[in-house]
Amino acid sequence: MPLLQIAEPGQSSAPHQHRIAIGIDLGTTHSLAATVLSGKPKVLNDVQNRRLLPSIVHYGDNTTHYGEEAKPFIIADPKNTIVSVKRFMGRSKADIKFQHPYELVGSEKNEMPAFETRAGRKTPVEISAEILKQLKDRAEDSLQNPVNGAVITVPAYFDEAQRQATRYAAQLAGLNILRLLNEPTAAAVAYGLDQESNLATDRNYVIYDLGGGTFDVSILRFSQGVFEVLATGGHTALGGDDLDRLIVKWAKKQLNIDVLSDEDYAVFIVAARQAKEQLSTQDSVELKLLEATLTLDRPTFESIIQVALDKTISVCKRVLRDAKLELTDIQNVVLVGGSTRSYAVQKAVREVFAQEPLCTINPDEVVAIGASITANQLIGNSQDGSLLLDVTPLSLGLETMGGLVERLISRNTAIPVARRQEFTTYQDGQTAMLIHVVQGERDLVEHCRSLGRFVLHGIPPMTAGQARIEVTFQVDADGLLTVSAREATSGVQAHIDIKPSYGLSEADTERLLIEGFQHAEEDKNLRHLKETKVEAERELEALEQALKVDADLLDEKQLEALNSAKESLKAQLEGSDIQAIEQAVQQLKVHSDAFAALRMNRHIDHALKGTKLDDWSKSN
């Protein structure tokens, strides 16, 4: 759906003017850019006719090297050669658990870490910006025109912090970012799944993305011009590198080797990778390992990696359940990522989905191609009417009394989206409210991830439960969250843009999802207990306030019975027997309802005192 642009009077651009927009795949291993020329997507080469830019930056004494030129320094100068910077985006120093050769500076929690390099301290955002700047320069050199806008792809599991870090990097690189696009969505666009001739009915697609280090799967639906991501899932420690390691493990067993030196391990890994690639077109290959030679055929290779393939299929089935679809509901399966070149991978997908997967576009380039098509559409060059809707990877909500989570936006909700809900005060005279925003699938705040807090001040003093605070969650097309709160009577309001200083790793995101599934029943029971306790505490609080004012209405026996019921409820609140708490609440209400009737009579008497019957009749 092209965006309408409004120009200043007398400054409208010519109707035929083509604006330059590019799609960028900012990858962990390599990055690339593409654009649409004469209606067709084209991957942009550098001056040496290379399409892929290795995502590597080396900081020397007086110069900086990028891509292929930086590669030799990985061994020669590892501390000043940054590779796989994407893994550091949106994380704190404490989040970075994996092994790396770098000297990181920064506090353990809230501060963005930086790499200590010969050129000074460099943050992941700055390094990513340098890679993006290389791609921007490549595009402008190739097209001989300035770039007007860019669509940058991100993994479906990137959270708000990681997406925001990507936006900052684009801004530092001088790019006008049109939007961030989930990588699987970009792949679907590249294959033109929204352009198929038979679109009278809804069509569902699986995007199976097996890269070097991670696996992602998405289910998309195209319906009446709208391209919607129904569900996403993945495995953060599963990719082509893991297939290579499985081959190495097999080879070690064949050769009766327990431990390999670092140098020998490198030889085994290279041989395993070559064998894996050759088996895509050959029935068998030879692995030359040290002074031995092993033969590996397709059936053996398939049995070696079956455990990894089973994991990917398990994720596919889970995402199908999330989307409430059966295997027979899927019209096409798209293969993305270099690891899907493997014959064994293609065979596994073919057998599970009972259809031939789409793999005609270079899997290393398909994401950038899809991003370029979307960029061309958003910049206004294309009249294509399809609309892309990504989804939220985790649920978003806020904390309520008792440490419970009230979800406003559920996971796998299409974005952009806004949700609004009313809340109220807990105590009499409450003039401020803390809004605590959380992310996750559990029912208790302590089991979810805190995204941020802000306070709404200036609430007019009222009786508990009378104030009306309207809270709005709004997620934009890039997956970035804004939360606002407004008190209805006074109009006071406050808001927060969720830009955490550090984010979730993909593994953390996956862990939160799995824990949500595993603890669903436990959380349901715990939530019931917490809600019961909150309601009981509210009854006790209201009773305490009433006794301060009108305790004289009760005789000694009534007061003793009420206090006894009150203490009994307090005792039950120390435990976790829901039925016992509910019974204690009901017993308290037997006595407190009689007390409430006495209070009501007193207040009516006060209201009518000194009022003539005729005056009262006239007023009614």
UniProtKB/Swiss-Prot annotation:
Name the Gene Ontology biological process terms.
iron-sulfur cluster assembly
Q: Which Pfam families does UniProt cross-reference here?
A: HSP70
Q: Does the keyword Nucleotide-binding apply?
A: yes
SUPFAM superfamilies documented for this protein:
Actin-like ATPase domain, Heat shock protein 70kD (HSP70), C-terminal subdomain, Heat shock protein 70kD (HSP70), peptide-binding domain
Task: Give one GO term, molecular function aspect.
Answer: unfolded protein binding
Q: Which HAMAP family match?
A: HscA
Q: Which PANTHER family match?
A: HEAT SHOCK PROTEIN 70KDA
Which family is this protein grouped under? Answer: Belongs to the heat shock protein 70 family.
- Protein name per Swiss-Prot or TrEMBL: Chaperone protein HscA homolog
> Which species is the source of this protein?
Acinetobacter baumannii (strain SDF)
- Give the lineage: Bacteria, Pseudomonadati, Pseudomonadota, Gammaproteobacteria, Moraxellales
